[in-house]
From Swiss-Prot:
Keywords: Ion transport, Membrane, Mitochondrion, Mitochondrion outer membrane, Porin, Transmembrane, Transmembrane beta strand, Transport. Forms a channel through the cell membrane that allows diffusion of small hydrophilic molecules. The channel adopts an open conformation at low or zero membrane potential and a closed conformation at potentials above 30-40 mV. The open state has a weak anion selectivity whereas the closed state is cation-selective. One of its GO terms (molecular function) is porin activity. Pfam families: Porin_3. Disulfide bonds: none annotated. It comes from the Eukaryota. This is Mitochondrial outer membrane porin. The keyword Mitochondrion applies. Consists mainly of membrane-spanning sided beta-sheets. The gene is VDAC1. It is found in: Mitochondrion outer membrane.
Length: 275
């Protein structure tokens, strides 16, 4: 289905290019599939001297998907998703965590050729209600994102965005943090080169500060991707990602502060196996 998509998708291409898969931790993920369909994913992440783990089970039956996650903090998170249950383009999501009794939430997503609507409400006595929408076409869209805390009767957030897309570029403008910050992002595919570039500029009105991040990625071959980025603080990062088996990836990334070269750089590695 065409259309503007959801509000959360505005500027996502640039963010993925600039931030996705960069890490300084050591992460290992293993996904297995049982004979009758359910998928089980185990993840272990080492952050400095701390190791955290998570195990996830996913079961699909027609248009119903059930995800159950358990982590090393003794939390169990369940998400039930129903696609096209009441009407075409409508997705219903129920999520809750144990033992957090205030974590329950119901979410509705609706995609149309000229609109993408997302509404959610917490399952508590005084819930937070969130409503976001993107309106327009796949080429030009405007959107807004609002959250109301019914306990205080105050807006927890109100944001707005504008997006322009054509065959090889995506540009977006986001007004965030209740109007306190303005972010412009840009994503461009260099024709027939396997290369994409992106940039993100954020201005804070309250502090009058700017932050700029520029990045690029290049497909060396169908199985290998390299990325690099640098920001105005002088932090530079690079990664290489290789698909060594179908759907199995090895990603090595590094970060260095160019203004303090004498400090040791940070290196992260992530291995995702899907045998």
């Amino acid at each position: 289905m065409g259309g503007p998509g959801l509000y959360s998708g505005i500027g996502k291409k640039a963010k993925d290019l600039l931030y996705r898969d960069y890490q300084t931790d050591h992460k290992f993920t293993l996904t297995t599939y049982t004979a009758n369909g359910p998928a089980i994913t185990a993840t272990s992440t080492k952050k400095a001297d701390l190791t955290v783990g998570e195990i996830q089970s996913q079961i699909k039956n027609k248009n119903i998907t059930v995800d159950v996650k358990a982590n090393s903090a003794s939390n169990v998170i369940t998400t039930i998703t129903a696609d096209d249950l009441a009407a075409p383009g409508l997705k219903t999501i129920l999520s809750f965590a144990v033992p957090d009794q205030k974590s329950g939430k119901v979410e509705l997503q609706y995609l149309h050729d000229y609109a993408g609507i997302n509404a959610s409400i917490g399952l508590t006595a005084n819930p937070v209600v969130n409503l976001s929408g993107a309106f327009g076409t796949s080429a030009l869209a405007v959107g807004a994102d609002v959250s109301l805390d019914t306990a205080t009767k105050n807006f927890a957030k109100y944001n707005a965005a504008l997006s322009y897309t054509n065959q090889d570029l995506i540009a977006s403008l986001n007004l965030n943090n209740k109007g306190d910050s303005l972010t412009a992002s840009y994503y461009h595919i260099v024709e027939k080169s396997g290369t994409a570039v992106g940039a993100e500029l954020t201005h804070s009105f309250s502090s009058n500060e700017n932050s700029l991040t520029f990045g690029t990625q290049h497909t060396l071959d169908p199985l290998t991707l390299v990325k690099a980025r640098i920001n105005n603080s002088g932090k530079a990062s690079a990664l290489i990602q290789h698909e060594f088996m179908p759907k199995s990836l090895c990603t090595i990334s590094a970060e260095v502060d160019t203004k303090a070269i004498e400090k040791s750089s940070k290196v992260g590695i992530a291995i995702a196996l899907k045998p």
